[in-house]
Amino acid sequence: MPGFAFVRDVSYVEFLDRVGREEQRLRAAGVWDVPHPWLNLFVPRSRILDFEAGVFRGILRDAKPAGPVLMYPMNRGRWDGRMTAATPDGGEGAFYAVGMLRSAVAAGDLERLERENAAVLAFCDQEGVGCTQYLPHHASPDGWRRHFGEKWGKLTALKRRYDPRGILSPGQGIFPAAAGGDEAGSDSL
């Protein structure tokens, strides 16, 4: 993508630690303890140019990111189908991980970044880009069902098997606690 590509050769360890280095930079500047409304998406390979046009050249064209924006291809063949991570539908051999790891450094940044994130998600939904969020937050169990799609049944089976008392990660709201408190045994799964 013209204007967005740059190459920097780094060691494998430096690549793996790229976000940690950003944290160190922000800590040194005294701005690590600010909100980080990060947005991480998996975008189908066939739609990455539509995403680039609508998001980077559209919604975010005038944005000055305070933090790294990462984009790199992922080989679908390296993802084990037993994993519960939601990846884009389709038979494409690759998809892109897009991470907008921005920080709300100045006054008003948090609200602006959250609006931009919402606009990115709305664009992807309206244009049928078919992206999925990585590490999302959904306000309802129904949102989580839509997020996991065909993997929802598998996820609920794993929850019943490994957390039958429903005590792990209750704050995420993926599985609402049933009236009796035994969420893993409830019909809501």
Question: Residues of each region from the PLM?
Answer:
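C-terminal substrate-recognition/cap domain of FAD-linked oxidoreductases
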Residues: M1-E116, L135-H137, R145
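Activity-critical C-terminal alpha-helical subdomain
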Residues: E23-G30, P37, E127-L189
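Generic, well-ordered alpha-helical scaffold segments in large soluble proteins
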Residues: F51-G58, F123, L158-R161
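Secondary-structure transition/capping motifs at alpha-helix termini
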Residues: G58-A63, Q126-E127, R165
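Short amphipathic alpha-helical surface patches that serve as generic macromolecular interface elements
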Residues: F95, E114-L121, W152-L155
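Long, well-ordered alpha-helical scaffolding segments within enzyme catalytic domains
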Residues: D109-C131
